[in-house]
């Protein structure tokens, strides 16, 4: 394990081959050396990186947000968490089938690649997306606000949190989407807390706002807090159950 975060490092020397965890976040790094083959977790967020070296095949967690990345290398087939928000990315490489959490907000995407069937969290807000790919049945959290979406694809039945305000959405295409949204609203009186934003359905929005206090939602369940809850915790069940 190598922890060298929160210094003023501008470069890293050659790395030991047996490293499995590297945390070099909160530095002034412009590049990274070749990564060890056995590396599983790489935290390199809050640097000045413009690119990443080839990723090891065993990598499961990649937190590279708040950099100046313009592209990502081929992703490991074992990758479960990818947090690349707030970069200068215009495309994503093919996403691995094991990916569970994808956070790619605040980039310049006009589209996303096909999503993993295991994906449970998708945060793609503040991009230039005109459509979303197929959303698979395991998806539970969806943040796609502040894009250019005109419609929503079919929503998974397990979806518990959805936020899609600030999009030019004209209609919810399928009746199944309406049913799912109704179920989400119904669950507001249960133990789960939900953050749900609607701009194009005023009556529904006002009804929702009467059920739970708007300040509480915005303060505690705004998408920006999702990063804090998840970026260092790969066990999504623990995180979600703590809400």
Spell out what each predicted region is.
Residues 126, 141-150, 156-209:
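Leucine-rich repeat domain C-terminal region
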Residues 6, 11, 16, 30, ...:
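Intrinsically disordered, low-complexity tandem-repeat regions
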Residues 12-15, 32-35, 52-55, 72-75, ...:
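Canonical leucine-rich repeat
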Residues 15-20, 35-40, 57-60, 76-80, ...:
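Leucine-rich repeat
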Residues 2-4, 22-24, 42-44, 62-64, ...:
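Conserved hydrophobic beta-strand positions in leucine-rich repeat
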Residues 181-243:
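Cullin-RING E3 adaptor/co-adaptor recruitment helices
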């Amino acid at each position: 394990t190598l922890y060298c975060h929160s210094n003023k490092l501008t470069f890293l020397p050659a790395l030991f081959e047996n490293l499995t965890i590297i945390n070099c976040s909160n530095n002034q790094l412009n590049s990274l050396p070749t990564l060890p083959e056995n590396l599983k977790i790489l935290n390199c967020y809050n640097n000045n990186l413009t690119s990443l070296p080839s990723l090891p095949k065993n990598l499961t967690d990649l937190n590279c947000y708040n950099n100046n990345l313009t592209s990502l290398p081929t992703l490991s087939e074992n990758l479960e968490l990818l947090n690349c928000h707030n970069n200068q990315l215009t495309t994503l490489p093919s996403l691995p089938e094991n990916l569970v959490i994808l956070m790619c907000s605040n980039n310049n995407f006009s589209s996303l690649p096909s999503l993993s069937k295991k994906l449970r969290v998708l945060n793609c807000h503040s991009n230039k997306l005109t459509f979303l790919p197929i959303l698979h049945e395991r998806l539970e959290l969806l943040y796609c606000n502040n894009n250019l979406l005109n419609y929503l694809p079919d929503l998974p039945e397990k979806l518990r949190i959805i936020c899609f305000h600030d999009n030019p959405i004209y209609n919810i295409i399928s009746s199944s989407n309406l049913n799912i949204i109704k179920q989400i609203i119904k669950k507001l009186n249960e133990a789960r807390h939900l953050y749900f934003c609607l701009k194009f359905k005023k009556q529904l929005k006002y009804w929702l706002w009467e059920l739970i206090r708007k300040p509480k939602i915005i303060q505690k369940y705004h998408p920006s807090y999702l990063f804090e809850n998840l970026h260092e915790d790969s066990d999504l069940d623990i995180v979600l159950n703590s809400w």
